[in-house]
Amino acid sequence: MNKKETRHRLIRSLISETTIHTQQELQERLQKNGITITQATLSRDMKELNLVKVTSGNDTHYEALAISQTRWEHRLRFYMEDALVMLKIVQHQIILKTLPGLAQSFGSILDAMQIPEIVATVCGDDTCLIVCEDNEQAKACYETLSHYTPPFFFSNK
């Protein structure tokens, strides 16, 4: 498990087991557990973990907001319809080209969907590299992704 996964696991644990009122409080609890991070990193982690501040009576605290799998699928379909430029399989990888500025959004959605064939996503400004274990898994992943493309996407290819 890498540092980020370890940190995310600890953050989820702290949020579910204790009442955290502020980012600073969460940052202090992480530090007590041996993890020192900047406020910017903590903010990114909280966004990736779908942590939201909720009000309960006079109390405000953070909770994890569950986003259903179908909601992620809906988002992927929406992005595929509006921003997909190219989807191409290359050996054990898939190249997903997007409109400028949207590749990281695709990567976040794919990561959240936890498609079993995807080992990692690496995204720049307009390109998302999807890495799979081998060629067969890349083909299976490509098939899965093609279900979310608009009907006209492959018609001229």
Curated annotation (Swiss-Prot):
A GO cellular component annotation in the UniProt record: cytoplasm
Superkingdom to which the source organism belongs: Bacteria
Keyword Transcription in annotation: yes
Location(s), subcellular: Cytoplasm
Pathway: Amino-acid degradation; L-arginine degradation via ADI pathway
UniProt cross-references to InterPro entries, sorted A to Z: Arg_repress, Arg_repress_C, Arg_repress_C_sf, Arg_repress_DNA-bd, WH-like_DNA-bd_sf, WH_DNA-bd_sf
GO molecular function, a single term: DNA-binding transcription factor activity
Keywords: Arginine metabolism, Cytoplasm, DNA-binding, Transcription, Transcription regulation
Main location: cytoplasm
Record bears the keyword Ribonucleoprotein: no
Biological process annotations from GO: arginine catabolic process to ornithine; protein complex oligomerization; regulation of arginine biosynthetic process
Annotated function: Regulates the transcription of the arc operon, involved in arginine catabolism.
Sequence similarity: Belongs to the ArgR family.
HAMAP family in UniProt: Arg_repressor
Full protein name: Arginine regulator
